[in-house]
């Protein structure tokens, strides 16, 4: 799989861009702040419908514009597929697949399968559980695009149940049985969709665990062994080598946990149980990586998680595109060498770097120089001719 063409309209600092790409390695070179990362961000958005830098779409639209457009042509096993995404301010985003409109933007997920390495990856180890949940969900969705619908259904039920908790927090004191019966209905829906999302995550962690261990050993052979496990908010800890619980068991566990925490939830007006509060636990030896790993160990764990994702996507039979956003500048020589070795085997690698010296020596790569210029549209990113 590779991206043959990337077009941008009013995306971040790019008023207009048409980039012809191909298999092999391409390096986007330019000073920081000139728009290199915006290219990688656009490709990642095309793959996942999300940015690795911000949680909302508004910052993706260039100042003064009312929408941004990302257009890609992806070649997979000799077949081309065109994806056009329109990111709109204040209204629903739109998508086209091979120039035909689709009902939901989620229908384009899976066309481009990519693995992103970025400086923000350190948050996978040192950041909040939300960063690790997003890592799992993005990867699960790339492997099984229907998971995007599962996530959307769960998030919708979670919002509605949380709103109900806030509105009926006094119902138990007033004896309003009807309001509490309504909460029972939403408990059931939350457990149903939550169990489906948890099952997908747990299955993914079981597949990731040996790949993470292997990748970490490659990156840091002198360090402690690495391990991952899924820790659920319903007082359940699911190690990677445990038998995967089925959806029925997970649903029953969620219902029981919701019943046990109901008083606390009504008192606080928030949902305290569910996959939105779960975590991917990362361990080095017998200690959690967060809080105990050194800077080098943290980077090794973060890169190992991405390498494991690459291995899983490749094992599925479709070579993912590697996106490396200024990551070589963050790594020491040993980790750069290990990552470069993996990158050399990929069908397409798209890299950003402030200076060419950040790129591994001996790499045969096409260089694309990025500049920032004043225009009628303000200061915009351009490709040097």
Swiss-Prot record:
Molecular function as annotated in GO: ATP binding; single-stranded DNA binding
Cellular component GO terms held in the UniProt record: cytoplasm
Residues noted as binding ATP in the record, renumbered to the chain: 30-37
SUPFAM superfamilies attached to this UniProt entry: P-loop containing nucleoside triphosphate hydrolases (SSF52540)
GO terms, biological process: DNA replication; DNA synthesis involved in DNA repair; double-strand break repair; SOS response
Record-linked InterPro entries: DNA-binding_RecF, DNA-binding_RecF_CS, P-loop_NTPase, RecF/RecN/SMC_N, RecF_2
Location relative to the cell: Cytoplasm
CDD domains associated with the record: ABC_RecF (cd03242)
Family note: Belongs to the RecF family.
UniProt protein name: DNA replication and repair protein RecF
Source organism per UniProt: Mycobacterium marinum (strain ATCC BAA-535 / M)
Organism phylogeny: Bacteria, Bacillati, Actinomycetota, Actinomycetes, Mycobacteriales
